Amino acid sequence: MSNQNERVAAAPFQEAVESPAQRILWERLRTYDHSFPLSDYSPETLFSSDLQTLEHEFRRFGVSELDRGDQDNYVNGYDALRSFHERSRSASVMGSPYGNLEDVPYLPSNPFFDQTPWSDDAYGYMYGIRNTLLSRAKDGIESHMLQYVIAKGLKETIDKIFDNLISHVCELMLDYYGHKVFRKLMEKCTDEQITRVLDIVLEEPFEFVRLCVHTHGTHAIQGLMRSLCSEEQISRFMETLCYVSLLLTKDVIAHRVILFCFNQFSPSHTRYLLEVIVQNCYQVAIDQNGCCMLKKLIRQSSRELRDPLIKEIISIAVRLCGNCYGNYVVQYLLRLKDYEVTSALSKHLDGNYVQLSYDKYGSHVVQKCLESREFSSRRIIAELLSDIDSLLVDPYGDYVIQTAWIVSEDHVRHVLLFYINRNVPFMRCNVYGRKLLQKLNIWT
């Protein structure tokens, strides 16, 4: 008997079902009835006002007026994720915003966002619960919705979003999703708002460094740099950056801020930053990340910027050659194949080739100099002959002699062969000497 009454009560609604979207609404109402049993769904029911509100919420999201493509999407996965604000309001009526799922976890078929969640009021979507705007910006799905609102919203909407996030700007810049919202917001901010962000970011140098060395923070800082437009803003930023630049150049992540700065701003703005790097060139070059930054800076910068840096590197080239990281900076200058650079470098290295050949890292530089067409290999070999007896049995010098043998012409090779033959008995008693004889195929 109860089943018959249930069919009678449901009949008016079943007759009204004309589209997949309305079937969805019908299924949701049946779920609501399962959670809160009612005698019927007539307007006189105690909960009729709640049901009307519920139906209005469905229509607000376009359920009752979908086109054919949207209907197909909702048929295949009608449980598209709604905003947190809408879910919280639905939960007060239905218990669970997606029906009585018992212990089954909810996995939305549409992992992105509603098609038109801000159809009524763009800012009303997020402003309903004021304190959750930061959590929305840090949410994987709702951050996309917030970025859309920022991109399409009016100035009043952006101002309200900015006022709610400005006090949490540093936390936002360090978050995986939040820093994307921050960068989008910077594109829409006024000069006054950007200045307010600068006041917070640059207030404490330690906090600024913490942002720059963070994976997401460094991208957020670069987004802020793109938004700087006035001379005052750029000058304030560069002043703080110069103060901590030595720390940033030695960090694997933060050195990108230094490189981006030279690409983003004019030489007049980066002049003092370049001076700091040049004055501390040796400290930067002997650091693992610093040497990489110097090579990128030389490769990417204009001649106006890189010439002072190259000049300083050449002046300390002998010291750099003996360092495990600094020698790569000197080798990079050889790869430029610039006659003026190699000529100046050759003048500073002359007289030091023997000393460098005994060094683990310096020997690599000597080998590169021998292979470089811009260097005179004959002059280098002539210097090596002054102490060739020791180089032939040295663990690093023997590699230099091998390279000299390969790059030398016949008449120079005959000179090398004379000295090698003279030291064969001594070389046979030494592990490195024997290896050299085998490499040169002159084992006798």
From Swiss-Prot:
Pumilio repeats lie at residues 128-163, 164-199, 201-239, 240-275, 276-311, 312-347, 348-383, 384-418. GO terms for molecular function: mRNA binding. Keywords: Cytoplasm, Repeat, RNA-binding, Translation regulation. It is found in: Cytoplasm. PROSITE patterns: PUM, PUM_HD. This is Pumilio homolog 15. Gene3D superfamilies: Leucine-rich Repeat Variant (1.25.10.10). The lineage of its organism: Eukaryota, Viridiplantae, Streptophyta, Embryophyta, Tracheophyta. The pumilio repeats mediate the association with RNA by packing together to form a right-handed superhelix that approximates a half donut. The number as well as the specific sequence of the repeats determine the specificity for target mRNAs. It holds the Pfam family PUF. One of its GO terms (cellular component) is cytoplasm. InterPro entries: ARM-like, ARM-type_fold, PUM-HD, Pumilio_RNA-bd, Pumilio_RNA-bd_rpt. SUPFAM superfamilies: ARM repeat. The keyword Cytoplasm applies.
